[in-house]
Amino acid sequence: MRVAVLGVGMMGQDHARRLATLTKGAQLVAVSDVDAARTDAVAAELGVRAVHDPAAAIADPEVDAVVIATPGFTHEGLVLEAIAAGKPTLCEKPLTTSPETARAVVEAERALGRPLVQVGFMRRFDAEYEQLRALVASRELGRPLFLHCVHRNATTPPNFNSEMLILDSVVHEVDIARFLLGEEITAITVLTPGRTAHAPEGLQDPQFVLMETASGTLVDVEIFVNTTFGYEVRTELVAERGSAMTGLGVGLVQHSAAGWGGRIAADFKQRFGAAYDTEFQRWVDAVRSGAGVDGPGVWDGYAAAAVCAAGVQSLRTGRRVEVDLGARS
């Protein structure tokens, strides 16, 4: 399967190298970026073609599938072009930057009549989250009552603003809550505690997010992106007959078999590197088998966009905001 990677910033370069050296059944044939010099450098490093127009890469008959790792505001146009061209696509999150444009992508794929677009919510491919989902589905611990989530980064890049804590960071918890619980989020509230002294001027960090699901399970998220000490992602399930936690560095821990420990990861690539590898291999396998998608699809991208848009509204107003996804196509 011949693949082009569109966007070769940090994530795109990582994906291009993965496809070139690790993913079985895939052949990286081209890279594209608005930065021509960077495109040429990555293409030379990996021995592939440099294409300076992403639309040309999508239309290229020598390209079977595309990975979109460009800035989020470009995703809608590129994904719609890929759908029109019938090219299987792995699109980094977000699917698009608004619920309205994400819904348009859902409708475009529906009109095509087959799944073509997978969204890059890589946590679904993490072994610990897969174990936790299986535990929830088994009902061994009874009905889920709470999900307690922690999402911490050491620092933020320049120009990172308060809304981006929701749109770029909490979006992962939105998707993983839907994945683990198997239901939609119906309301969200964003609270703002005191600011850390390490946050840049004007950035509200940390934030506390409370989400409600259709069945009444509560999902809370501590999002703290300027901790200075490392990268931590943890999720604790509290159910009727027990609890279980991921993210302690030793696999899934149940309190009935206590004992845990481990090092704090330096960044998300260290914590979720294996999940990215699995994500790409399963995507390539799905495309080659004709399934098209093996993971989160366009509806998942739309649902995440809708919940995050409601979260931004709550951040601005300080109020609880309901989420209405409408009918699923």
From Swiss-Prot:
Its EC number is 1.1.1.18. One of its GO terms (biological process) is inositol catabolic process. Keywords: NAD, Oxidoreductase. It catalyses: myo-inositol + NAD(+) = scyllo-inosose + NADH + H(+). The keyword Oxidoreductase applies. It is an enzyme of class 1 (oxidoreductase). Pfam families: GFO_IDH_MocA, GFO_IDH_MocA_C3. SUPFAM superfamilies: Glyceraldehyde-3-phosphate dehydrogenase-like, C-terminal domain (SSF55347), NAD(P)-binding Rossmann-fold domains (SSF51735). GO terms for molecular function: inositol 2-dehydrogenase (NAD+) activity; nucleotide binding. Homotetramer. Belongs to the Gfo/Idh/MocA family. PANTHER family: INOSITOL 2-DEHYDROGENASE (PTHR43593:SF1), PTHR43593. Involved in the oxidation of myo-inositol (MI) to 2-keto-myo-inositol (2KMI or 2-inosose). This is Inositol 2-dehydrogenase. It comes from Kineococcus radiotolerans (strain ATCC BAA-149 / DSM 14245 / SRS30216). The lineage of its organism: Bacteria, Bacillati, Actinomycetota, Actinomycetes, Kineosporiales.
